[in-house]
Amino acid sequence: MTSLLTTPSPREELMTTPILQPTEALSPEDGASTALIAVVITVVFLTLLSVVILIFFYLYKNKGSYVTYEPTEGEPSAIVQMESDLAKGSEKEEYFI
């Protein structure tokens, strides 16, 4: 009964926190599984990073590549065709509903 009444020494009180308590060494199996998990996480991270970099370079390289169907400025046939289309547009058109 005397052990219940005695107060622990200050050194023993400090050891009650989980950080300061002595830890057991990892077994070789636990160390190997920890290393395997670290390798898998690293490979996944590097794969995602490389995919993001490839997408960035692809989008940067193909920026602004589109085709317009507008006639060029110097084509006289296109200008004449546009003028004839404008002349047709001035006529009154009827729409039946």
Swiss-Prot record:
Print the keywords alphabetically: Cell membrane, Cytoplasmic vesicle, Glycoprotein, Membrane, Sialic acid, Transmembrane, Transmembrane helix
Superkingdom to which the source organism belongs: Eukaryota
Tissue-specific expression: Detected in breast, endometrium, colon and biliary tract. Detected in polarized epithelial structures characterized by cell-cell adhesion (at protein level).
Q: Which residues lie on this side of the membrane: Extracellular?
A: 1-36
- Kindly state one GO CC term assigned in the UniProt record: cell junction
Instruction: Give the way it sits in the membrane.
Output: Single-pass type III membrane protein
Residues on Cytoplasmic side: 58-97
> Which residues are noted as glycosylation sites?
2-3, 6-7, 9, 16-17, 23
Question: Which InterPro entries does the annotation name?
Answer: SMAGP
Q: Where in the cell is it found?
A: Cell membrane; Cytoplasmic vesicle membrane
Q: What is its main location?
A: membrane
Residue spans crossing the bilayer: 37-57
Record bears the keyword Transmembrane = yes
Is Disulfide bond given among the entry's keywords? no
Tell me how the protein is altered or processed after translation.
Answer: O-glycosylated. The O-glycan is modified with sialic acid residues.
What function does the entry list?
May play a role in epithelial cell-cell contacts. May play a role in tumor invasiveness and metastasis formation.
Family statement drawn from the similarity comment of this UniProt entry: Belongs to the SMAGP family.
Indicate what this protein is called per its UniProt record. Answer: Small cell adhesion glycoprotein
The species this protein belongs to is Homo sapiens (Human)
